[in-house]
Design a protein with these regions (language model features):
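Conserved short "hinge" loops at termini or chain/domain junctions
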Residues: 1-51, 112, 116-139
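Divalent metal-cofactor coordination and adjacent catalytic microenvironments
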Residues: 15-93, 107
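Polybasic, proline/glycine-rich intrinsically disordered low-complexity segments
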Residues: 91-124
Length: 139
């Protein structure tokens, strides 16, 4: 876990989560409709349209990916301050190894979610495969 969130205010936490969300939007390849954020009359950040639960999950997984990358970068800076042998003895080395494995799993799951998202559409409340749009009979 990230102890930083225990040390910062709720406003700072919300700002950081907003940054993670904004960074995750470009990772979302080919959404069915544009995903954008605007500020409403109350000064709150809101999406310009309603997102499906699937789109929310994809953005959330993108936020996790960005957060893990941030953690890995922080540990990498620590590694650069120590010599190779000294770093291997620290718990940071073990933590980096675990984060690397977690990042691989998160990226795989994120790609799977995007793949499923791109292969269907919802019509009249039912999921419909778009496979026919990808594979067309040659005439």
């Amino acid at each position: 876990t990230d102890d930083m969130y225990m040390e910062i205010t709720e406003e700072e936490t919300r700002a950081d989560c907003r940054d993670l969300l904004l960074a995750s939007i470009p990772l979302f390849e080919f959404p069915n409709e544009v995903i954008d954020i605007t500020t409403n009359k109350d000064g709150e950040d809101v999406f310009t349209r309603n997102l499906t639960l699937e789109e929310q999950n994809i953005l959330g997984m993108g936020m996790v990916q960005i957060w893990i990358q941030r953690q890995m970068s922080s540990i990498e800076v620590t590694r650069q301050k120590f010599s190779g042998a000294d770093f291997k003895l620290t718990s940071q080395a073990s933590h980096l190894k675990q984060l690397t494995a977690l990042m691989t799993n998160v990226k795989d799951e994120y790609r799977r979610m995007l793949m499923i998202y791109s292969r269907h559409e919802i019509k009249d409340g039912k999921w419909k495969s778009t496979f026919g749009n990808m594979v067309k009979r040659m005439s």
